[in-house]
Amino acid sequence: DIILQLAINARTGLRKLPSNVRLVDWIPMGVFLNGADGFIHHGGAGNTLTALYSGIPQIVFGEGADRSVNAEIVAKRGCGIIPDKHGLTSDLVNRLLYDDSLRFCSDQVAAEMAEQPSPAEIAEVLMRKLKNNGK
């Protein structure tokens, strides 16, 4: 099944969707990606980092702002694919869903991210250093 998150104002000209596609206005990424097999998105930092944290392979379009950099990082790390001039194809989607190396690399990055200290832990260290003149 496919969940298609698309704002109402972006639906002009949208064709009838197959029965296995559920159209939603908005859904929290953490909930959406829990149990997902793949994620296709524009490459914004929120989507990219949430997918990396969740261990989900990605197809990242990466057009505009920081999105191209995010897409390149995901692809270089082996966690995703940047579409070429042909755009999104069935071959690309099949690779996203069935390429074990994409899943393996995505799982590795998720494990690395999980090992990082939490923001609260970092804040505690910084506060201690401030109180002790940087020591």
Predicted regions and their residues:
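Short, structured coil segments at secondary-structure junctions
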Residues: 17-19, 54, 77-78
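A donor-sugar binding/catalytic signature common to diverse glycosyltransferases
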Residues: 24-73
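Structured helix-beta-strand junction loops
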Residues: 35-36, 77, 116
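Short hydrophobic alpha-helical runs that function as membrane-insertion/retention elements
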Residues: 1-4, 59-60, 81-83
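Donor-nucleotide binding loops and adjacent catalytic segments primarily
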Residues: 1-38
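Class I S-adenosyl-L-methionine
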Residues: 15, 72-76, 107
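C-terminal amphipathic helix plus adjacent low-complexity
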Residues: 90-135
